[in-house]
Amino acid sequence: MNKDFKYKNTVGIESTYPKDMPEDHSNIPVWNSENWFYEDVIIDHKIRSLRRTISEGEAMQFNGMVLDMHPYVGDEHFAKNEGLFKKRLVAGAMVFSYGLGLVATNCVNSFSYGYDRLRFIKPVFIGDTIYTIRKNMEKKPKYEKMGLVRTSYEVFKGKGEIVLYCEHLHSVLYKKPQDFKDQFEKK
């Protein structure tokens, strides 16, 4: 729990209990997985990730994996001699992936619905250290069995310079769907 108790820890609120393994194994809480529902989402709740430095090797591995060989991310000579920043960038797709991955909660009742307002605000360079702050912005009933939750992600580098912003829509299962039967969109 953090110092001022304003934001409660979320990992390990409740675990899942698979029936296809020995019961004594099933009763052990699952590492890095959560079991919260729509009703459990607290608006304005924030979490912050650990920091992570992006190395040259992993940047090139990511570029190769996604076939992004733009000179700004893959050509040291171009970046130094002709590029606007005079050094190589980390691919925006990598900053997005790493930034969101740093605060991924692996909730078994939540499913990605899509992303809005993705912006690459400032460049990230090889050797930069990033961290992410995630905030629950809003929620609304949407379907018979699940609602939508909008979450913001702000990725920072160094001592707090914002480099990326996006909003993630999650569809999240209701704990008690009957409580929302008159609130969801009917088709």
Where are the regions a protein language model picked out?
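Hot-dog-fold acyl-thioester-processing enzymes
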Residues: N2-Y113, K175-K187
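Short peripheral tails and domain-boundary helices/loops at the edges of structured domains
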Residues: K3-Y7, T151-Y174
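Intrinsic-disorder/low-complexity, polar/charged segments enriched in Ser/Thr/Lys/Arg/Asp/Glu/Gln
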Residues: W36, I42-S49, T129-Y131, L148-R150, ...
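A short acidic/small-residue loop/turn micro-motif
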Residues: S55, E138-K139, H170-V172
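Hydrophobic small-molecule pocket/channel-lining residues, especially in calycin-type beta-barrels
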Residues: F62, P71, A79-E82, S110, ...
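Hydrophobic beta-sheet segments that form the core/acyl-binding groove
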Residues: G114-G158
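A structural preference for long, well-packed, hydrophobic secondary-structure segments
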Residues: R117-K122, H168-L173, F180-F184
